A protein has these predicted regions:
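Polar/charged, compositionally biased leader and regulatory segments
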Residues: 2-103, 218
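A generic structural motif
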Residues: 103, 122, 138, 164-167, ...
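Generic structural motif
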Residues: 97-99, 124-134, 174-177
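Zn2+-dependent peptidoglycan hydrolase active-site motif and core
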Residues: 111-114, 128-167, 197
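Short polar/acidic secondary-structure junctions
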Residues: 106-108, 123-125, 139-141, 185-188, ...
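Short glycine/threonine/proline-enriched tight-turn/helix- or strand-capping micro-motif at secondary-structure
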Residues: 80-85, 98-127
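Conserved, short, structured surface segments that act as functional micro-motifs
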Residues: 146-152, 170-218
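Conserved positions in beta-strands of structured domains
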Residues: 100, 119, 133-135, 164, ...
Length: 218
């Protein structure tokens, strides 16, 4: 992501008939410490805005590649100065609402935890959060274990890690709520859970800024 535009980055989260406009830093700064490329984002306001028309596939505005072998291949993608993330149609990816580890810096490991860990049992059904297309289905022994990456038509990509089994294949189109894997304990983990990430052009966004997990809604 190029910082030439990030200072004026405006993200709108469209949900339930209104948009929440995020003009910069609270979305990113509250995640601190974050990737050094994002530390210069301007201070923000959160406001309601009228619903607006959106593209059928806003992700086409962002991504210029389709890499099926890496979770994080992005180097040059740029987000428009104003971009609407349509959160309508969200499906809770797990049967559980229990977040066991939150997004943020982990002093004990000296690294960022760039997603949420949600309690699941091995074999629990994991579903796609939105409509989209499967980009990656792989195994990462030192990290995600069995994982799936889905690019959604709203511009987000979601990552589902530590699965016991993947139920989808690369280039498969999926609907929100459609099973994509089974919960598990593969990869670098200390117990059965789902590691869930939300990213825009490769940059992690705290899923709890987007979704209300206790309510299983946006």
């Amino acid at each position: 992501m190029n910082l030439n535009f990030v200072r004026r980055l405006g993200l709108s989260l469209l949900a339930s008939g209104f948009a929440v406009t995020l003009l910069g830093q609270d979305l990113i700064a509250r995640q601190a410490p974050v990737d050094r490329r994002l530390r210069a984002v301007d201070s923000i306001a959160i406001q309601r805005a009228v619903e607006r028309d959106i593209l059928i596939d806003p992700s086409a505005e962002i991504y210029n590649s389709w890499v099926t072998t890496k979770a994080h291949p992005y180097r040059s993608e740029e987000v428009p100065d104003s971009f609407v993330i349509d959160l309508r149609g969200f499906a809770m990816p797990t049967p559980s609402r229990q977040v066991t580890s939150r997004f943020g810096y982990r002093p004990a490991f000296r690294r960022m935890h760039k997603g949420l860990d949600i309690k699941v049992y091995t074999g629990d059904t994991i579903v796609s959060a939105f409509d989209g297309k499967v980009r990656v289905v792989r195994y990462d022994a030192g990290g995600y274990g069995n994982y799936v990456v889905i690019r959604h038509t709203n511009g987000l990509e979601t990552i589902y890690g530590h699965l016991s089994k993947q139920l989808v294949s690369i280039d498969q189109e999926v609907k929100a709520g459609e099973p994509i894997g089974l919960g598990g304990n593969t990869g670098r983990t200390f117990g059965s859970h789902l590691h869930f990430e939300t990213r825009l052009a490769g940059e992690p966004i705290n899923p709890e800024f987007l979704f209300n997990f206790p309510a299983q809604d946006v």
